[in-house]
Amino acid sequence: MLDTTANDEVQALLDTFGAALERGDIDAATACFQDECYWRDLVTFTWNIHTSEGKEAIAGMLRSQLAATRPSGWKIAAGESAAEEGGVTTAWIEFETGVARGYGLVRLMGGKIWTLLTTMVELKGHEEHKGFNRPLGAKHGAGKHRPSWKEEREAEARELGYSRQPYVVIIGGGQGGIALGARLRQLGVPAIIIEKNERPGDSWRNRYKSLCLHDPVWYDHLPYIKFPENWPVFAPKDKIGDWLEMYTKVMELNYWAKTTCKSAKFDEKTKEWTVVVDRDGQEVTLKPKQLVLATGMSGKANVPTYPGMETFKGDQHHSSKHPGPDAYKGKKAVVIGSNNSAHDICAALWENDVDVTMVQRSSTHIVRSDTLMDVGLGGLYSEQAVQSGMTTEKADLIFASLPYRILHTFQIPLYDKMKEIDAEFYAGLEKAGFWLDWGVDGSGLFMKYLRRGSGYYIDVGASQLIIDGKIKLAHGNVKEIVADG
């Protein structure tokens, strides 16, 4: 019996799958999948972010979308090879549809598809102006009264939103809105980003003094311009703010700072939005076809209310308004909460000679930064990963390829290992009285983030202060705040 390579196995399956799709045979296409199977589609088939779980759901999606999608050319991606580990064969793939070029990741078990990720790389006829298609920039030849690049940009800034309407308005000018604006710019789509702060990057600059990123640099690249090789692994907030401001300029984004949205209404007849904004005191009406809300998941302060707050004689504020520790030197402070911001603020207060107490109202998941980087992220987001050929784009797609239904099964063993590596650390926290948890199923940080968006701390030093009793600890919900504290 002849041995078949992993490449042969994957390509044979793709040939069968692709042929079934091309002839519209949905039964034959779904027969290429395991009984337990998942197809995560990012735009290519569904024009949405959609996960189909099981053969029946996949068949339903194909009945709805296959005729319009017209997929073809399924093959292992150029320059890639399939790999087998633990009974699972994985391969990067590429394909086309009637209107787009696609890329994806397939996992086979027993010769059939277990998970399939399909993503849209580019629309045919609307390719980005980069690489061989990059703009020339200089206008060679001669012509009278030609505007310079600077004059063209100034004219665009004067006209867009006034004499000429944007196709897209993005509400929110943090990193998400900025990255989307950059993508649209490269596609030639007129867009305006509106942001309430005075400058790009202020959503970072305005946070508490000691804030640094808790994710590593390899996790944080923006499209087109990667952070330089000497960029710190965990960048401080003001450095990030400056980078975002630079990025909006060099990527030629139409960024309206000091602008707030007053109202937005969609007209079903004209299929356009009427968006009224206040631009630095001037009311402007925009008429985009598309409106995007990029206001962030953690930007709005969740401010609790307690009896007696109005009588308290000292300073009180939410972490989003925390000015830093300098004004509190030699005083006592209470920080209500036990997640990332609370730990960072407590540590900075202790460093500046403040007698600080953390009030822990419920259990918190804690993972040491070094261990998380090594065990949890090292294979995808690290210098070692880069040296092995991993890119941020591929790492992101690997994460995206795992449906939430099974993502926890990949995470639990990692956090079991972290728990074992840092057993002494966790014993110290428990001895100090800190309430720990590992998520509802022991799957740790990422699942807790996806499920709740909170409830965790990536330890960069504050936990040891709790273990040592330097940050005091109190438990339970706040009953009342008294005038004298």
Q: Residue ranges of each PLM-predicted region?
A:
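Flavin (primarily FAD) cofactor-binding/catalytic cores of flavoenzymes
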Residues: 166, 189, 194-196, 237-340, ...
